[in-house]
Amino acid sequence: KWGRLDALVNNAGTTKFVQHTDMDGLDGSDFQSIYGVNVIGPFQMVRAARNALKASGDASVVNVASIAGVKGVGSSIAYAASKGALITMTQSLARVLGPEVRVNAVCPGFIEGEWLAEGMGRETYEASKSFLEAKTPLQKTCTPESVAESILGFIEGHSIVTGQHLVLDGGHLLL
């Protein structure tokens, strides 16, 4: 309709909530399913959109990864590994698609919301949120709005930045 594609945000993701210590809680099909959505899906989207993005001349791809891919934490080992792979793929795609397309990733930490509360269990969610708000340097956690703001920053600005991942965690990595 508009004849161009200036931005692509790969925000689809999935997980299976399994404690990292529960090695029997995940099997090969769990890994394949999680990788399919979290890594292969974004690759296929970029591959399908690359010509339109390059034709724009100054396009941006933003992959939504996770602090799990930086720190090896999160809902499951498969999820952490998939988000680490997405961060690495972000760097590879930045090399391939430049100079016409910038490719970056945002890596949210704990995100406030019902989805996470349901996955973690309300008690664990509230305890984690309270801990992070008390101990992180910024004394707050991510919100969907703060994630969107960072994605928009990569799309509308940061014209010299590609191949990077931005951790959105209120300073959690500093603990």
Model-derived regions, located:
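Short, small/polar-rich loop/turn modules that mediate ligand/substrate recognition or access, typified
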Residues: 98-102, 161-163
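Alpha-helical segment proximal to the catalytic Tyr-Lys
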Residues: 51, 94-99
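Residue(s) in the substrate-gating loop at a strand-loop-helix junction
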Residues: 66
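C-terminal substrate-recognition "lid" of short-chain dehydrogenase/reductases
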Residues: 46, 140-168, 173
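Short, flexible catalytic-loop segment of classical short-chain dehydrogenase/reductase
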Residues: 107-118
